[in-house]
């Protein structure tokens, strides 16, 4: 019997997409609540004083620090004619956000991988082909009405004493290594499906269904033809291969701004060999992600696409725990390039690094970060490859490893003219490359430099880039979350 490759959907897919419909619903609910309040006489003699409301203080997200809003001079502080670096900073401002204290570790990313594994097992335990235990999937509400099915996470997987069908379901996500003969998790099955609503595209006037609302200048004629939009979708073939397509069609409603992605979440452990030819890095390939000794090291071999999938899962994981209160949190995401640089430099427009000095070491010769101190010498700073996160002192914002250790993905797309294209208020340039786009359109900005880079390349004011589907032994990531605050 051919084994099916299962794809796991995030819980967000079981909810109405949060587009303008969702936002309108939230506003309507708020207005309804306000209208149901007791209509007390105004203490201002009939003057409009506004509706009442409780104060709100956002709790600190686990493992994150608050980066207060601020302005700074973004870009190279100091030029270098030898390397073609031109000092051309520009003033920008960013709003407040939460940022992970450290890079995402192997341990945290494993939690994501194991969640996907357990989701597949639960899906199969509910499948009639594996015994059909209906307790693992909820298909009716409390009144017995049919609903869109979702997995029951309150039902534990029978790891210790499974019956025959349960054992088949559990073992179906594992494979026997043809070389070692050991049973191991099958990475090819670990696919995560998620949906992202494109709020920016949905808000643009040119994409409104009502032509009279696309242009307010009455001197300009507006076509009655429906706008043409592009959206990403994905599916699995019968062989279990991921297929991605970009569809262009006439706009029909908010659901057309909902993009679907399928991402295999397992890191590329072979990156250690492919990044360094003629080097003995096999132990890293075998052990770096799988061995518990590396749990607190930054995850690597993760593409920009996988980092985004993790961010979506992390958001959904928290919202599922918070219940109704979860709708009020901002999603976890990759930082914009401007946010990343501001956090790395701790808002200091004069600093090239996360520290104030121009050298990467103090007066005692102790290094401030994990990088390549000199040609051929990786170990002078005490490490050969990556180091445990938080090994070195944090910057003035309390954030660790913003220089060296691993370079970090940002959400920002790369183009040579990016500084001319972006605003000076929360600057960001996004380009969702279609599958058919030239490869150069799939470049994303990475920041911070890594354990393999010289001091020049771990400067906080310099950018680099990588293709969004590449998985490198020197690129990881961390998350941010926009602050809900009005101080």
Locate predicted features:
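Sec-dependent N-terminal signal peptides
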Residues: 18-28
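Short capping motifs at secondary-structure boundaries
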Residues: 97, 104, 113-124, 313-321, ...
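Short, structured beta-strand segments at or near domain termini in extracellular proteins/domains
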Residues: 473-487
């Amino acid at each position: 019997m051919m084994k099916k490759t299962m794809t796991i959907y995030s819980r967000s897919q079981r909810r109405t997409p949060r587009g303008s419909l969702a936002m309108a619903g939230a506003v309507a609910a708020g207005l309804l609540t306000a209208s149901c309040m007791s209509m007390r006489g105004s203490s201002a003699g009939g003057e409009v004083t506004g509706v009442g409301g409780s104060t709100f203080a956002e709790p600190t997200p686990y493992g994150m620090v608050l980066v207060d809003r601020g302005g700074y001079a973004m870009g190279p502080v100091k030029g270098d004619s030898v390397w073609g670096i031109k000092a051309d900073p520009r003033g920008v401002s960013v709003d407040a956000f939460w940022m992970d204290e450290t890079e995402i570790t192997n341990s945290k990313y494993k939690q994501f991988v194991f969640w996907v594994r357990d989701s597949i097992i639960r899906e199969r335990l509910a499948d009639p082909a594996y015994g059909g235990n209906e307790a693992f999937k909820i298909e009716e509400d409390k009144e017995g009405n049919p609903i869109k099915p979702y997995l029951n996470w309150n039902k534990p997987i029978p790891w210790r004493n499974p019956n025959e069908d349960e054992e088949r379901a559990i073992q179906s996500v594992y494979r026997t290594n043809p070389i070692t003969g050991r049973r191991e998790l099958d990475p090819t099955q670990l696919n995560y499906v998620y949906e992202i609503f494109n709020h920016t595209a949905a808000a643009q006037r040119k994409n409104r269904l009502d032509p009279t609302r696309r242009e307010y200048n009455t001197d300009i004629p507006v076509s009655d033809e429906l706008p043409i939009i592009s959206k990403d979708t994905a599916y699995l073939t019968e062989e279990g291969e991921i297929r991605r397509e970009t569809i262009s069609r006439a706009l029909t409603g908010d659901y057309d701004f909902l993009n679907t992605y399928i991402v295999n979440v397992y890191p590329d452990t072979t990156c250690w060999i492919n990044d360094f030819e003629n080097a003995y890095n096999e132990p890293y390939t075998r052990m770096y992600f799988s061995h518990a000794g590396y749990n607190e090291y930054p995850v690597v071999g993760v593409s920009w696409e996988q980092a985004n999938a993790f961010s979506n899962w992390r958001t959904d994981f928290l919202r599922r725990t918070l219940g109704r209160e979860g709708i009020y949190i901002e999603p976890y995401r990759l930082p914009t390039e401007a946010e990343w640089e501001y956090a790395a430099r701790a808002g200091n427009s004069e600093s090239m690094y996360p520290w104030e000095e121009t050298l990467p070491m103090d007066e005692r010769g102790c290094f401030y970060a994990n990088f390549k101190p000199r040609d051929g010498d990786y170990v002078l700073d005490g490490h050969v490859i990556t180091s445990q996160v938080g090994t070195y002192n944090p910057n003035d914002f309390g954030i660790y490893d913003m220089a060296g250790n691993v370079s970090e993905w940002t959400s920002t797309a790369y183009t040579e003219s990016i500084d001319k294209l972006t605003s000076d208020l929360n600057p960001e340039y996004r380009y969702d490359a279609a599958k058919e786009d030239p490869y150069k359109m799939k470049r994303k900005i990475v920041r911070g430099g890594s354990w393999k880079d010289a001091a020049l390349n771990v400067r906080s004011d310099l950018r680099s880039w990588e293709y969004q589907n590449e998985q490198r032994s020197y690129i990881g990531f961390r998350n941010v979350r926009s602050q809900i605050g009005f101080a």
